[in-house]
From Swiss-Prot:
The gene is crebl2. Gene3D superfamilies: 1.20.5.170. Residues 1-23, 95-119 are annotated as: Disordered. One of its GO terms (molecular function) is DNA-binding transcription factor activity. It is found in: Nucleus. Residues 62-69 are annotated as: Leucine-zipper. It comes from Danio rerio. Residues 10-21 have a biased composition (Basic residues). Residues 23-86 form the bZIP domain. This is cAMP-responsive element-binding protein-like 2. Its main location: nucleus. Probable regulator of creb1 transcriptional activity which is involved in adipose cells differentiation. May also play a regulatory role in the cell cycle. Keywords: Activator, Differentiation, DNA-binding, Nucleus, Transcription, Transcription regulation.
Length: 119
């Protein structure tokens, strides 16, 4: 034979390796590509919506913590002036006896802040 090789009873011609693409339906390929792009855009939109919701929830949490910090600062300023805020009086008096579970959380939270602040 000339340049052909015989492998497992088949005659192979030298040249390109691998699969030879069959006649590709260009319209079908283009439609698959468009569908894939639509799905990609939809996934991207959902991801951005999720991230925006996450950011807004974190911003709300930050605002709540800032308000709580301002409240504690006001309490400290009042105690520096010799006044005891009514909220602290309520914590120190009967409220702890009425609801020990909820106040114990508040008490540990307050003690955590007062021990860590150098005021």
């Amino acid at each position: 034979m000339d340049d052909s090789k015989i492998v497992a009873g088949k005659v192979k011609k030298p040249g390109k390796r691998g699969r030879k693409p069959a006649k590709i339906d260009l319209k079908a390929k283009l439609e698959r590509s468009r569908q894939s792009a639509r799905e990609c855009r939809a996934r991207k939109k959902l991801r951005y919506q999720y991230l925006e919701e996450l950011v807004s929830s974190k911003e709300r949490a930050i605002c709540a913590l800032r308000e709580e910090l301002d409240m504690y600062k006001q309490w400290c300023l009042a105690m520096d002036q010799g006044k005891i805020p009514s909220e602290i009086k309520a914590l120190l008096t009967g409220d702890e006896q009425k609801t020990p579970q909820s106040c114990s959380n508040k008490t540990t939270k307050n003690s955590k802040y007062s021990s860590s602040s150098g005021i």
